[in-house]
């Protein structure tokens, strides 16, 4: 091919020639950048790069919240110089040390998660533009601030699909730059990897926001709807008498064609369609903006994937992308369940039938000639999957295929157990399977049944069993009654928080009279089973916190009922309000949680969003009480979501397994010089309480996590009523779950007597006098002296010197 050069040509003498100009590479982004620069009000970081947030914001966070590194091993195996032993402060052959290497390891996981969401967004955006055109409006509900994460990063406020493209290009460009820093001989400083990880986290929330806003607009999902329909959830909701199509993954694009085919052929009441992971959440949002009676169902999280397959219930399985088990094809093949791969990111080595005739492909799959196929043509996919499900069901019913053992087989397998303990050692949850098998030998299967909810369905136990006992099948066999009764309700993902809801709650959140926002997100790698997140959500809802949920957390909360048979979604309203349980949607909907905090700053406080991340994050860190919970986090996406919250000043608590991410961000509360900010009115330094005391940490139990999260909602700007409310909750929860007296550092958060919980104010004043030496005026019941922090209702705390008036 000849090299293109600059020049010109004339069309003056040409006849009957049509010249078509399609996309000009980079033109949309260049035009967007020029448009953003013309903004009258804009912050300093429009279209930021790797260095943009480093000195102005990230290093300020990392100075207070120091990285705590938890290596998985002492070696680095990145290049052919290695493996290198980095223990004992040694450096590798390339010069990197343990801190730098582990900073890179954590950073790599964050950019992997960011790339996953960004690629999801790119796939949806391109497909939806091709299907609906660039002019399709972003109708997301009654809001003017539609895309706060996009706006913060780029200054753009897209109003249709086409206007989203520059933001998508920006994320992809920066991801390339970030990935380059992982190469050997690039970055080696742990703190700079942390800064880059924070930047990548901010990009992740842009990628997620793109993914969700385009699908909400195009697929007619609920639009900021607090009354979104309730959806059936659980394995027990599946009608086994009907053909069953099971969809797994996170990208709902292809599933919408299956649902359209069902509706066009009047099959919605003749077969079941249900899903696992976030595809399940999003298929139940499809065309639900008008609250039509839903027919799609949710089975549950990734932890249920192998359990559902082993049950033999699905007649066809369709996978798209993300959080899909790598052994689905061999597991499904044992039970003659065809597997259809509908996304190029997961193809499982299956034959590609995208260009083949649908009838021929159905015959291949029915006969078992192929275990499954790749189908990337969505029109064909819709027809193929529905027709195949209807035709496979009678074939599989006639054969009676299932992996669940008979009673006789169960007894034989249990008797084979040698009590060697290999399964216990292999289990990531440390389930005492040998003990349960011992009781089963005596005829007591209740211990095995008790493992059902805690088991994450990984089958590591089966792979180490020398007797080749199908342990997962045994657990599922003895839990058949429990599975049949596994029926709950989950509110369909409602989409973003509306501007009106922010206006109604913004003041309460900033003043502290609404105790805080608790965001329960993430994966199912729980240490003690799914009910942990139910307990946590219920406790905070009872105390009038706003509880927002997404993804697996949103599903698992809906699995359990109270004594009256009601789930939390039935007991609490779906609005963004005190005591509201707000299911935002799937994993990509997490962007609306950070978006809500950003909108508090933009709508309530009138702060500029455009290119202004540091100021918005500074506002959130000092004023908006919020804490995330990723109790079962396992994936790279969970790390990128959490890190995107961290750069915005939102702390997150992770479950006990999450130390394997290799890094936490925890402040030293005793270093008083780290707990000073500027008063924006005059630029003077002012002390603040150690709140929040971490940005990223882990807890061992849900009982430990609850008071930790309540404390993490305390903010320097709380007024006295808000501070008293927050102290009440934190201190009560500490006593309830950790036992004994008040937390040892409660007094650090008291600025005057009005900050003290009203119910036991006098008793606490006595403690302050006796234990801390504070001077109390007992006639007026006022604190005369003692607090190091004085309350000033008009103070304007900021970490950014440039925001002070004198600056």
Swiss-Prot record:
Gene3D superfamilies: 3.30.70.20, 3.40.50.2030, Carbon monoxide dehydrogenase alpha subunit. Chain M, domain 1
Domain observations: Cluster B is an all-cysteinyl-liganded 4Fe-4S cluster; cluster C is a mixed Ni-Fe-S cluster which is the active site of CO oxidation. Cluster D is also an all-cysteinyl-liganded 4Fe-4S cluster that bridges the two subunits of the CODH dimer. Contains two additional 4Fe-4S clusters, dubbed E and F, that probably transport electrons from ferredoxin to the B cluster.
Residue ranges of every copy of the 4Fe-4S ferredoxin-type domain listed in the record: 407-436, 446-475
Domain of life: Archaea
GO biological process assignments: acetyl-CoA metabolic process; methanogenesis, from acetate; response to hydrogen peroxide
Enzyme Commission no: 1.2.7.4
Similarity remark: Belongs to the Ni-containing carbon monoxide dehydrogenase family.
Cofactor(s) required, per the database record: [4Fe-4S] cluster; [Ni-4Fe-4S] cluster
Name recorded for this polypeptide: Acetyl-CoA decarbonylase/synthase complex subunit alpha 2
Species per Swiss-Prot/TrEMBL record: Methanosarcina mazei (strain ATCC BAA-159 / DSM 3647 / Goe1 / Go1 / JCM 11833 / OCM 88)
Record's subunit section: Heterotetramer of two alpha and two epsilon subunits. The ACDS complex is made up of alpha, epsilon, beta, gamma and delta subunits with a probable stoichiometry of (alpha(2)epsilon(2))(4)-beta(8)-(gamma(1)delta(1))(8).
Matching InterPro entries: 4Fe4S_Fe-S-bd, 4Fe4S_Fe_S_CS, CdhA, HCP/CODH, Prismane-like_a/b-sand, Prismane-like_sf
Role: Part of the ACDS complex that catalyzes the reversible cleavage of acetyl-CoA, allowing growth on acetate as sole source of carbon and energy. The alpha-epsilon subcomponent functions as a carbon monoxide dehydrogenase.
Cofactor note: Binds 7 [4Fe-4S] clusters per heterotetramer. Binds 2 [Ni-4Fe-4S] clusters per heterotetramer.
Classification via SUPFAM superfamilies: alpha-helical ferredoxin, Prismane protein-like
Positions annotated to bind [4Fe-4S] cluster 4: 427, 455, 458, 461
Reaction catalyzed: CO + 2 oxidized [2Fe-2S]-[ferredoxin] + H2O = 2 reduced [2Fe-2S]-[ferredoxin] + CO2 + 2 H(+)
Chain residues that bind [Ni-4Fe-4S] cluster: 250, 278, 323, 523, 552, 587
Sites where the protein binds CO: 117
Recorded GO MF terms: 4 iron, 4 sulfur cluster binding; anaerobic carbon-monoxide dehydrogenase activity; hydroxylamine reductase activity; iron ion binding; nickel cation binding; peroxidase activity
Binding site for [4Fe-4S] cluster 3: 417, 420, 423, 465
């Amino acid at each position: 091919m000849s090299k293109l050069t600059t020049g010109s040509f004339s069309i003056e003498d040409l006849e009957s020639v049509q010249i078509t100009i399609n996309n000009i590479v980079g033109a949309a982004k260049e035009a967007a950048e020029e448009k953003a620069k013309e903004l009258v009000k804009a912050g300093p970081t429009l279209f930021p790069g790797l260095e943009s947030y480093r000195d102005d914001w990230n290093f300020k966070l990392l100075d207070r919240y120091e990285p705590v590194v938890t290596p998985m091993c002492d070696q680095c195996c990145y290049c052919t110089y290695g493996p290198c032993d980095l223990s004992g402060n040694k450096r590798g052959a390339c010069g990197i040390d343990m801190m730098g290497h582990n900073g890179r390891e954590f950073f790599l996981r964050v950019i992997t998660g960011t790339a996953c969401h960004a690629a999801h967004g790119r796939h949806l955006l391109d497909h939806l533009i091709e299907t609906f055109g660039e002019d399709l409006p972003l109708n997301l509900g009654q809001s003017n601030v539609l895309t706060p994460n996009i706006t913060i990063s780029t200054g753009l406020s897209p109003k249709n699909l086409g206007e989203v493209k520059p933001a998508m290009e920006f994320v992809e460009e920066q991801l390339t730059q970030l990935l380059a820093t992982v190469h050997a001989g690039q970055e080696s400083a742990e703190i700079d990897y942390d800064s880059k990880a924070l930047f990548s986290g901010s990009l992740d929330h842009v990628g997620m926001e793109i993914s969700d806003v385009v699908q909400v607009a195009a697929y007619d999902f609920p639009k900021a709807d607090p009354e979104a329909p309730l959806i059936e959830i659980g394995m027990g909701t599946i009608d086994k008498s009907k053909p069953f199509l099971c969809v797994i993954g996170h990208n709902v694009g292809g599933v919408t064609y299956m649902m359209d085919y069902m509706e066009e052929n009047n099959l919605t009441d003749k077969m079941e369609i249900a899903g696992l992971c976030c595809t399940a959440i999003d298929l139940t949002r499809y065309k639900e903006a008008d609250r039509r009676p839903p027919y799609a169902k949710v089975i549950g999280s990734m932890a249920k994937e192998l359990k559902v397959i082993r049950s033999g219930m699905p007649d066809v399985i369709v996978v798209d992308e993300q959080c899909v088990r790598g052994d689905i094809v061999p597991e499904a093949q044992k039970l003659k369940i065809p597997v259809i791969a509908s996304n190029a990111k997961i193809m499982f080595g299956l034959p590609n039938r995208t260009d083949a005739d649908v009838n021929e492909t159905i015959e291949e799959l029915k006969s078992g000639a192929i275990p499954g196929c790749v189908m990337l043509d969505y029109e064909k996919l819709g027809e193929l999957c529905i027709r195949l499900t209807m035709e496979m069901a009678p074939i599989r019913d006639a054969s009676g295929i299932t992996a669940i053992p008979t009673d006789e087989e169960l007894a034989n397998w249990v008797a084979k157990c040698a009590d060697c303990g290999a399964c216990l050692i292999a289990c990531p949850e440390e389930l005492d399977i040998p003990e349960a098998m011992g009781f089963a030998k005596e005829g007591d299967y209740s211990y095995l049944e008790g493992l059902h909810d805690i088991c994450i369905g990984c089958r590591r136990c089966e792979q180490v069993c020398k007797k080749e006992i199908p342990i997962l099948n045994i657990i599922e066999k003895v839990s058949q009654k429990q599975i049949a009764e596994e029926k709950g309700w989950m509110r369909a993902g409602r989409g973003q928080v509306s501007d009106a809801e922010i206006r109604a709650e913004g003041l309460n959140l900033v003043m502290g009279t609404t105790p805080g926002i608790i965001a329960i997100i993430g994966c199912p790698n729980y240490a003690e089973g799914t009910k942990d997140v139910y307990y946590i959500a219920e406790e905070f809802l009872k105390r009038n916190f706003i509880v927002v949920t997404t993804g697996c957390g949103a599903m698992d909360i809906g699995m359990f009922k109270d004594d009256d048979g009601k789930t939390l979604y039935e007991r609490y309203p779906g609005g963004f309000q005190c005591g509201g349980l707000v299911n935002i949607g799937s994993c990509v909907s997490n962007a609306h949680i950070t978006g809500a905090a950003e909108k508090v700053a933009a709508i309530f406080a009138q702060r500029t969003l455009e290119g202004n991340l540091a100021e918005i994050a500074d506002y959130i860190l000092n004023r908006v009480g919020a804490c995330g919970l990723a109790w079962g986090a396992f994936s790279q996406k969970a790390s990128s979501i959490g890190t995107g919250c961290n750069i915005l000043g939102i702390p997150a608590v992770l479950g006990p397994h999450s130390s394997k991410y290799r890094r936490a961000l925890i402040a030293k509360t005793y270093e008083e010089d780290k707990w000073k900010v500027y008063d924006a009115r005059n630029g003077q330094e002012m002390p603040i309480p150690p709140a929040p005391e971490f940005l990223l940490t882990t807890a061992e139990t849900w009982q430990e996590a609850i008071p930790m999260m309540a404390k993490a909602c305390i903010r320097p700007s709380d007024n006295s009523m808000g501070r008293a409310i927050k102290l009440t909750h934190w201190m009560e929860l500490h006593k309830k779950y950790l036992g004994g007296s008040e937390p040892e550092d409660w007094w650090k958060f008291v600025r005057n007597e009005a900050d003290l919980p009203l119910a036991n104010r006098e008793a606490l004043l006595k403690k302050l006098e006796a234990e801390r030496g504070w001077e109390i005026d007992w006639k007026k019941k006022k604190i005369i002296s003692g607090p190091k922090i004085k309350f000033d209702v008009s103070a304007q705390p900021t970490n950014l010197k440039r925001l002070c008036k004198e600056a």
